[in-house]
Structure formats: C-alpha cells, structure tokens
Curated annotation (Swiss-Prot):
A motif ('HIGH' region) lies at residues 52-61. It comes from Rhodopirellula baltica (strain DSM 10527 / NCIMB 13988 / SH1). PANTHER family: TYROSINE--TRNA LIGASE, MITOCHONDRIAL (PTHR11766:SF0), TYROSYL-TRNA SYNTHETASE (PTHR11766). It comes from the Bacteria. This is Tyrosine--tRNA ligase. Catalyzes the attachment of tyrosine to tRNA(Tyr) in a two-step reaction: tyrosine is first activated by ATP to form Tyr-AMP and then transferred to the acceptor end of tRNA(Tyr). The lineage of its organism: Bacteria, Pseudomonadati, Planctomycetota, Planctomycetia, Pirellulales.
C-alpha cells in the first residue's frame, strides 16, 4: 500500500486539486477557485454522507471513501457521516421508485456494518483523524414543528421542484412521496449542523447528489450567512453508462461474508479493457507514471490483463488485507491448474461455483471406487467411453489438477483428501465438480 503522507502546504492543495482533475474526479464544483483558496488557507473539514441501506457498502461506495481518503492524505479532516436518520427515509436521487423503509433494529445493524468498513479506507487516529458521525444523534430530539420553523421555511417549493432528483421522480410512474420529498431538507440540515459544530465547509458526493449538496449550500447561506462549497465526482459506471458493482449473482460488497475476497478480486480482474484505466484513476492511488505505463501495456498487449491485475491487487489489499490478496490469488491459480494444496471445501465450491457439477454418493468411492471413464461421462466432460479413453491417453484429464493417464484409474475416498468435492478437468479450462454426498 502507498505510504501515508501528511501535507498541509499550498503546494499540497494544488497537488490535490490537480490530482483530482487528472483522475477525472471533479465532475462538478460550486466554486473551484473558492475551494482552492479555502484549502490553501489551512486544513479544512470535508464530509460525505453514506446512507446505511444494507449491512455493507458495495463497490460504488468506494468512490466516495477514496475521495475522503485523498483529502485526508493531503492534510485535511474527513468526516464520514452515516445516515442513521436519513436512512429511515431514503434518498430519491437516482432511484426509480421508493425504497422499503427499514426497521430501527435493521438500520442500526446496517450502521454498525458500514462504519466498520470505513476503517479500511480512513485513519481514525493522528493529527487529522477522520471522524465517524451519525446524523441520528442530532435529529432524534429535533421536533417536527421546530424543524419546519428552522429549516422548512428556508426552502422555496419551486426551487425544490426544479431539482433533477425531484423532477425525474415526479415525471415517473412511481411518483414521489412526501417522505422522500423531505429528504433534501434533512441532508441540507446535516451540512448546516456540521458547519456549526465542526466548521465543515465542504461537502462531496456522487454526481447524483448535486441537488442535495447545493440545497445544503443555500441553507447554510440563509441560516448561517456562511459560504459553503460542494464537489461531486462521477458515478462508477462502465463505458456504456451502466453502474458498476453488479454481477449475475448480485451486488459486489465490501463485506467478505457477502462477497468473498476471491469473488471481489475476480470482479476487478474481469473489468473490460475500456473501463480498467478509469477504475485505476478513480479508485486507486497509483501515480501518474505507473498509470501511463499500465495504459500502454493495456493497448499493446491486452491479453496479459496487466492493468486489471494491478487494479484487483490494489483494491483487494485495501479492503481485505494482504491475506485476502494471497487467498484470492491462490484461488485464481487453482482455476488455471495450480495445486489445490490446503484449499478447503468451501473455497473450492466458490472457485468453481460457475462450472457444471453433479452429485455422487460417497458409496461410489468406497471399495473398488468409481472408474475414471465413468466419472468423466457422469460429469459430462466426455461424450462416451471411447471419448474418455482418448482424453486420458492424450494426457488431457486431471483430477484435483493432477494429470491422470491411467485408463484403469479408480476414484476412491483417498482422492478426496479430506474434502467432499473432486475437481475434474479436461484440457486447459473445461472443468466439472463432483460433489460427494454421504
């Protein structure tokens, strides 16, 4: 991982702004020159909000965590705000329909899970330690009438209706509930509260948060007479505009219980060539020289997937540690024919989750065992006994990634090596999994 560097000089600010610019992370700013002047005046506080809609963040949330991380590395003070209050309502920005409202218990579980993951990205100790706050702490005792008097009176309905996040939902079939319509007021007040209590002058977020961020800036001017600033970064999307972080099996999470280090690593290994350089710029801290080198290698020899390997290694180490990287790389080697070693049942089932499989009773491996020719046909790796014999004689059959050439080979309990699965392979990449049932 890159060494942590503390910088507070004007050169550091210029470097930060320039770094954000070349990475393509400055999607919109309310006043770029004003932000640069503010950052040059000394360490500043910046915040980004995260609504706890699940017990884990998914990869899209890394864009914002990395934004806070970049500001912290430049000597500024990041606040990660968990929406214990706003999460009860749900942000309509970028959503086609209203979310189901979460119970208080589920919301707290989500808050706890998301908060723990932020520690992989931010340093919560030291001179410019990150702060983890929850907006439920200042909203829980704020009465509805007081909120309307203090905050609601500062929001012209016409201006709210003009926000893209509101207008698009009003024009949709799903419509927009009053609950969601009120979300903008709550997020705007978060900015005002943090400006009062932590002298926070900058809010950042994804491009879909522009309306909410500017609402907070307007409220700060009305309530505090203070100039606040906003920055948005692009959303993490593919070159054709689809949001990244989804696979056929669902979202790619940061929680290893929901998306294993191996699956997380593989997601980045499989990023398309036209997307990988953008991901490296958005999500890592690699320097410009290395970026340019990886870009050249991707153009000249895309088959090596050098940029994808670097992206997968960098992000997996950040989220899952060095052990997670080693585990993921070992699993990848197995997929390409490496020794199984001490790989467990569950790891093998995960590595080969997408290959054909069949159930075999354990009794078939007892006594004389299961004839390899029959096993290859059962697993549909060979069409007939003759096909299986040819594959064996040509040296193209593997059991647990060990070559088998003996046509009379019998698979027995000893071949399981304490596991409950057998990995069969024909050729380089044609796999099947035998799941042994008691």
């Amino acid at each position: 991982m890159p060494k942590r560097i503390r910088m507070t000089t004007s050169n550091a600010t210029n470097s930060l702004i320039e770094d954000l610019r070349w990475r393509g992370l400055l999607n919109q700013t309310t006043d770029e020159n004003g932000i640069a002047e503010l950052l040059n005046s000394g360490p500043q506080t910046i915040y980004i909000g995260f609504d706890p809609t699940a017990t884990s963040l998914h990869v899209g949330g890394m864009m914002q965590l990395m934004m806070l991380r970049r500001f912290q590395r430049a000597g500024h003070n990041p606040i990660a705000l968990v929406g214990g209050a706003t999460g009860m309502i749900g942000d309509p920005s970028g959503k086609s329909e209203e979310r189901n409202l979460l119970s208080a218990d589920q919301l707290q579980k989500n808050v706890d899970g998301v908060a723990a993951q932020m520690r992989h990205f931010l340093d919560f100790e030291g001179d410019n330690a990150a702060k983890l706050l929850n907006n439920f702490d200042w909203m829980k005792d704020y009465s509805y009438l007081e909120f309307l008097r203090d905050v609601g009176k500062n929001f012209p309905v016409g201006a709210m209706m003009g926000k893209e996040s509101v207008r698009s939902r009003l024009e949709s079939e799903a419509g927009l509930s009053y609950t969601e319509f009120s979300y903008m007021l709550l997020q705007a007040y978060d900015f005002v509260n943090l400006a009062q209590t932590h002298d926070c002058r900058i809010q950042a977020g994804g491009s879909d948060q522009w309306g909410n961020i500017t609402a907070g800036i307007d409220l700060g001017r009305r309530m505090l007479g203070k100039q606040l600033f906003g920055i948005t970064a692009p959303l993490l999307t593919t070159s054709d505009g689809r949001k990244m972080g989804k696979t056929e099996s669902g979202a790619v999470w940061l929680d290893p219980e929901r998306t294993s280090p191996y699956a997380f690593y593989q997601y980045w290994i499989n990023v398309a060539d036209e997307d990988v350089m953008r991901c490296l710029a958005y999500l890592t801290e690699i320097e410009r020289a290395e970026y340019d080198e990886l870009e050249d290698k991707t153009k000249n020899d895309p088959g090596q997937r050098t940029a994808q390997k670097r992206l997968a290694q960098w992000l997996t180490e950040l989220v899952h540690g060095e052990a997670g990287v080693q585990s993921a790389q070992r699993a990848t080697q197995i997929l390409f024919g490496g020794e199984l070693g001490d790989t467990t049942d569950s790891q093998l089932r995960e590595i080969f989750a997408d290959v054909p499989s069949c159930d075999v009773p354990k009794s078939a491996l007892e006594g004389e065992g299961l004839w390899i020719v029959e096993a290859l046909q059962t697993a549909k790796l060979c069409n007939s006994g003759g096909d299986a014999r040819r594959a064996l004689s040509e040296g193209g059959v593997y059991v647990n990634n060990t070559r088998v050439e003996d046509v009379q080979k019998r698979l027995t309990v000893d071949d399981l090596d304490g596991r409950s699965v057998l990995v069969l392979r024909r050729g380089k990449r044609k796999y099947a999994l035998l799941k042994i049932q008691d």
